[in-house]
Amino acid sequence: MLLKVEQLRDSVRIALLTPYDGGNLGDSAIQAALIANLRRCEPHVDLCGITLHPARTSARHQIPCYSLTATSRSHYRGTKERDDGERPLPVAEASVGLYRRLRRMARAVPFVRWLKTGVDETLHAIRSYRLLRDVDVLAIAGGGQLDDEWGGSWGHPYALMKWTVLARAAGSSVAFLSVGACRIESRLTRLFLKTALSLACYRSYRDAESRRLALGITPRADGSVVPDLGFSLSGTSIEPSIKTEGAPLFVGVSPIAYGHAALWPTADQVQHERYLEELAGFVREILRRGVSVTLFSSSPPDDQIFADLLERVELGLDSASRGRLCARNSETVEELFDVLHAVDLVVASRLHGVMLSFLSGRPAIAISYDRKVTSLMAELGQAEYCLDIHSFKSDDLLRRFFALQAHSKVIQSAVASTCREYDEVLKRQCRDITRLALRRRRSRFRRNGDTYSKEARDSGPEGRPGIKPVSGPMTASATETPGTGNRDEMSYGKR
């Protein structure tokens, strides 16, 4: 259902857009951090999410969430909600079978398929516009959103273009917050991203190279370099692992499904097999030296390669070594931190697998599959502990591991200091965004001949006007709701 607001004048409204389906714990950390910071800066802020899986993300973050896309593509799959939430009426099995056959036949006809896509897109655009009329700021909320690897040009690049155009038409401001640029290959992707970036009144990028790539798309994409939103995750404790002399060592290893033919959009099975062999060789060697190893993942595709890696590691191992090897699945960021706090050192490949390790006070070696991981390690002063996934050898990894173990205390202290600095920068960015939202709301009141009710705002949540749910297929219900807005220019000093 959509949420219709009657006479909402007492709180700003911000919509957080992300290609997040509730499974990737790095994206989950980003959204949790941003939500907490926005509420800290503006206690009366009303938030909603625009995601690939509204029901799941709404349940996880306790805000209402709406469908990001009308259609699904390979490696970019959205979900739709039922219009009324009712169960379908019982139908005879024969009728169900006939219905399914007719649907398959219809989808096989190009014209019918294109017509359905057009109708779905039109209806989704109308509902999205209705939502955005009640939003002050559409925030493109962190992560590697300038990218066409997952879903192609008609995946997220198109979604960004569509939502930013609709936001401006609805009178909302658009802000890109600490976004990253990854693979940008096709001309169509560049056109979609050029439109989206040009319509924003605030832009920040999580690293200098992302900013450079964005400026290569359009000179109007200028913005600040502001760290990844995950660095401001509240509730994290950067507590160094304290080991007594001779105590057993525990290591967390987070493999990645990079190149896997069935799990990664750009398949390179030969590279994937080579990666698993080298990683297995490293894990096998440290197990033989008495180290305990825990396999973990921060994204659903990666845990699907645990069995393959375990099989390779266990070849030639004695029973004692096998007993020190285990795998743990994490469904939430909190569970992931439990895993990280139980180990002393980490070997990971995903950006947020590495970043969250440092946030938990655990030094990490990165086996980098992408520029963003290499950039993160360099910014944290850990470039010597970063290996290229395409060329690393198990012996190289073993040498870096021993060096990391020897210098772990120094690394923990240095990285903790940098993380605190990043947290302060991110808090300033959130204050800027809430000020932008407040300006949009006040300008809307003045334009409509209304006055801003400070007394009502100070009365707190119980003094807010009521919110009426109305039917519509876009959203998963939760306790928060969205707001109204328009455009307002603002700047942010370069870090």
Which sequence ranges carry the predicted segments?
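Intrinsic disorder/low-complexity segments
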Residues: 479, 484-486
